[in-house]
Amino acid sequence: MSITQERKQELIKNYAINDNDTGSSAVQCAILTERINNLTEHFKSNHKDHTSRRGLLILVGRRRRLLNYIKKKNVSEYLDLISKLGIRKIK
């Protein structure tokens, strides 16, 4: 359930700080969120796919660690990012 190259470039363009930015925390978080959403849709029709479910949990943990880092670094950037991505605050 990977995302297409075009969709990834679109996410990079929307969340990048400058034109050459492809790996900032916000961009990584946006790409991970897209992958998580794709896997969530996959599980609606393939509920017995436990191997992919483990992969989903790994992705969610990675995104949570990135969000913790962003929150420590800049709270306003964190709040802006989670509102753009449509995800809940972490505690």
Swiss-Prot record:
Keywords: Ribonucleoprotein, Ribosomal protein, RNA-binding, rRNA-binding. GO terms for cellular component: cytosolic small ribosomal subunit. SMART domains: Ribosomal_S15. It comes from the Bacteria. InterPro entries: Ribosomal_uS15, Ribosomal_uS15_bac-type, uS15_NS1_RNA-bd_sf. GO terms for biological process: translation. One of its GO terms (molecular function) is rRNA binding. It holds the Pfam family Ribosomal_S15. One of the primary rRNA binding proteins, it binds directly to 16S rRNA where it helps nucleate assembly of the platform of the 30S subunit by binding and bridging several RNA helices of the 16S rRNA. Belongs to the universal ribosomal protein uS15 family. NCBIfam families: S15_bact. Part of the 30S ribosomal subunit. Forms a bridge to the 50S subunit in the 70S ribosome, contacting the 23S rRNA. This is Small ribosomal subunit protein uS15. It comes from Rickettsia bellii (strain OSU 85-389).
